Amino acid sequence: MAFPLPRGITPPEISFLAEMEMVTILPRQRLEGLELLGGPVEPLLPPRRASLPLWLALLLKRQRRANILPPPWLHPESLSLILEIETQHHEYQHAFSPPPPLPGQPSLRDRGKRPVAMPRYTPDGGRYYPAPPFLPQNVAQDHVPSGEPPSLPFHWLEVGTMLLDAASDDLVDPDQTRRLLKELREVRTAKIRSGVDVLDAASTGGGGVALTGVGAMEVGEGRGFIAGVVDGLRKIGASKEQARREQMAEDMANGGYDATQDDDDDMEF
């Protein structure tokens, strides 16, 4: 008997998409330019840095033809600060640390300014707005703006795990980095599960779960759990509504039904 297909995108598929994230490498050998589906890749000339898709960077790393430079957020200091924001800041007690700003979106230090999203254009003139994994959220930076807090990109868990598995010797203190990533995942998973408590009110229009800053893998892993809870609450609400209608019909049949009761209920709702 075949099992039903999982809802939404699966974790292996999310990891596959994350391999298109651009990372920074330091080539150890010369390599001619490549023509890929995502666009051309410039020739690799040591010791000049280059930005490549993660899957190609991992391939060159396994062949010992390049070293991968970790993104700024994958340093122990940055992860420790993000973990502190997630656990100790009252503002983010039930929320997630702010994600990196999108193109045209003001950063935290420029909060209050009007966002101006700048579109990009395809070779045939089509307009589009880039989004992960097509944003430079995982490339190395020589200079990080002062006052700009570190933030986790959309594919933080997948990129961090793959870099720890294949390029741990290129990371700063990989053991501590792995521990901090594990703690961050546990803290954020607990927030997602605790947010399910408000879904009962959300099913009746009373609230919802804020998912701003949630990563791709977290969405994929929590989709089945949250969808199951919502379906269960919907069934419970339907049974309550059916029982209420049956009670109304019985009261009307007995002549004891008061129409003003529904008006009061609607006003309270």
Curated annotation (Swiss-Prot):
The keyword Ribonucleoprotein appears for this protein: no
General function of this protein: The GINS complex plays an essential role in the initiation of DNA replication. Has a role in chromosome segregation.
Subunit structure: Component of the GINS complex which is a heterotetramer of sld5, psf1, psf2 and psf3.
Name of the protein in its database record: DNA replication complex GINS protein psf2
GO biological process, one term: chromosome segregation
Database matches in InterPro entries: GINS_A, GINS_bundle-like_dom_sf, GINS_Psf2, PSF2_N
Biased segments, Acidic residues type: 260-269
Disulfide bonds: none
Region (Disordered): 92-112, 241-269
Localization in the cell: Nucleus
Keyword vocabulary terms for this entry: Chromosome partition, DNA replication, Nucleus
Gene: psf2
Origin: domain of life: Eukaryota
Family to which the UniProt record says this protein belongs: Belongs to the GINS2/PSF2 family.
One Pfam family linked to the record: PSF2_N
An annotated GO cellular component: GINS complex
